[in-house]
Protein backbone atom coordinates (compact mmCIF):
# COMPACT_ATOMS: atom_id res chain seq x y z
CA UNK A 1 0.00 0.00 0.00
CA UNK A 2 1.15 3.49 -0.65
CA UNK A 3 -0.39 6.77 0.27
CA UNK A 4 0.18 10.33 -0.84
CA UNK A 5 2.10 13.15 0.77
CA UNK A 6 0.37 16.44 -0.02
CA UNK A 7 2.59 19.54 0.19
CA UNK A 8 0.76 22.83 0.68
CA UNK A 9 1.09 26.41 1.96
CA UNK A 10 -0.83 27.27 5.11
CA UNK A 11 -2.44 30.65 5.85
CA UNK A 12 0.78 31.87 7.51
CA UNK A 13 2.72 31.15 4.31
CA UNK A 14 4.55 28.13 5.71
CA UNK A 15 4.95 24.83 3.88
CA UNK A 16 3.32 21.77 5.42
CA UNK A 17 2.66 18.19 4.43
CA UNK A 18 -0.02 15.68 5.28
CA UNK A 19 0.08 11.97 4.59
CA UNK A 20 -3.14 10.57 3.20
CA UNK A 21 -4.08 6.91 3.04
CA UNK A 22 -5.54 5.34 -0.11
CA UNK A 23 -9.05 6.19 1.12
CA UNK A 24 -8.17 9.91 1.25
CA UNK A 25 -8.04 10.15 5.05
CA UNK A 26 -5.22 12.27 6.48
CA UNK A 27 -3.23 10.05 8.85
CA UNK A 28 -0.23 12.28 9.67
CA UNK A 29 0.43 16.03 9.53
CA UNK A 30 3.58 18.12 9.82
CA UNK A 31 4.61 21.29 11.56
CA UNK A 32 5.17 24.38 9.42
CA UNK A 33 8.40 24.79 7.43
CA UNK A 34 9.82 28.10 6.19
CA UNK A 35 10.71 26.72 2.78
CA UNK A 36 9.71 23.92 0.47
CA UNK A 37 13.06 22.13 0.70
CA UNK A 38 12.69 21.83 4.48
CA UNK A 39 9.21 20.41 3.98
CA UNK A 40 10.49 17.86 1.47
CA UNK A 41 13.23 16.86 3.91
CA UNK A 42 10.45 16.28 6.47
CA UNK A 43 8.66 14.00 4.00
CA UNK A 44 11.86 12.00 3.46
CA UNK A 45 12.33 11.70 7.22
CA UNK A 46 8.80 10.30 7.59
CA UNK A 47 9.42 7.79 4.79
CA UNK A 48 12.66 6.69 6.46
CA UNK A 49 11.39 6.50 10.04
CA UNK A 50 7.81 5.26 9.52
CA UNK A 51 8.64 1.52 9.47
CA UNK A 52 10.45 1.70 12.85
CA UNK A 53 8.02 1.16 15.72
CA UNK A 54 10.48 2.71 18.18
CA UNK A 55 10.07 6.07 16.42
CA UNK A 56 6.42 6.39 17.50
CA UNK A 57 5.58 8.30 20.65
CA UNK A 58 2.18 7.06 21.78
CA UNK A 59 0.25 9.59 23.84
CA UNK A 60 -3.01 9.85 25.70
CA UNK A 61 -4.42 13.34 26.02
CA UNK A 62 -7.27 14.08 28.42
CA UNK A 63 -10.87 12.98 27.95
CA UNK A 64 -10.00 9.57 26.49
CA UNK A 65 -8.24 10.96 23.43
CA UNK A 66 -5.27 9.10 21.99
CA UNK A 67 -2.69 10.29 19.45
CA UNK A 68 0.90 9.73 18.35
CA UNK A 69 3.95 11.58 17.13
CA UNK A 70 6.48 10.17 14.69
CA UNK A 71 10.02 11.18 15.63
CA UNK A 72 13.23 11.24 13.60
CA UNK A 73 16.51 9.78 14.82
CA UNK A 74 17.37 13.14 16.43
CA UNK A 75 14.12 12.91 18.48
CA UNK A 76 12.50 15.80 16.57
CA UNK A 77 8.78 15.33 15.86
CA UNK A 78 8.30 15.01 12.09
CA UNK A 79 4.60 14.17 12.08
CA UNK A 80 1.57 14.22 14.36
CA UNK A 81 -1.62 12.19 14.14
CA UNK A 82 -5.20 13.21 14.61
CA UNK A 83 -6.93 12.39 17.90
CA UNK A 84 -8.40 8.91 18.20
CA UNK A 85 -11.22 7.75 20.48
CA UNK A 86 -9.41 4.60 21.62
CA UNK A 87 -5.95 3.19 22.08
CA UNK A 88 -6.75 0.46 19.55
CA UNK A 89 -7.77 2.93 16.84
CA UNK A 90 -4.61 4.97 17.50
CA UNK A 91 -2.53 1.82 17.07
CA UNK A 92 -4.31 1.13 13.76
CA UNK A 93 -3.37 4.68 12.73
CA UNK A 94 0.29 3.90 13.45
CA UNK A 95 0.06 0.73 11.34
CA UNK A 96 -1.50 2.77 8.55
CA UNK A 97 1.43 5.23 8.58
CA UNK A 98 3.88 2.30 8.57
CA UNK A 99 2.11 0.82 5.54
CA UNK A 100 1.46 3.99 3.55
CA UNK A 101 4.46 6.28 4.13
CA UNK A 102 7.52 4.44 2.78
CA UNK A 103 6.38 4.34 -0.86
CA UNK A 104 4.00 7.30 -0.86
CA UNK A 105 4.11 9.70 -3.78
CA UNK A 106 4.50 13.44 -3.21
CA UNK A 107 2.13 15.97 -4.78
CA UNK A 108 1.64 19.71 -4.37
CA UNK A 109 -1.88 20.93 -3.67
CA UNK A 110 -3.46 24.37 -3.60
CA UNK A 111 -4.31 24.69 0.09
From Swiss-Prot:
Gene3D superfamilies: 2.30.29.80. It comes from the Bacteria. Pfam families: DUF1508. InterPro entries: DUF1508 (IPR010879), UPF0339_domain (IPR051141), YegP-like_sf (IPR036913). Keywords: Repeat. SUPFAM superfamilies: YegP-like (SSF160113). The keyword NADP does not apply. Belongs to the UPF0339 family. Duplicated subfamily. This is UPF0339 protein in ptx operon 5'region. It comes from Stutzerimonas stutzeri.
Amino acid sequence: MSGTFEIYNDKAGEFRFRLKANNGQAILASEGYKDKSGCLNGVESVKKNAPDDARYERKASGADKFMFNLKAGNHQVVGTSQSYASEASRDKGIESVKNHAPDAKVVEVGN
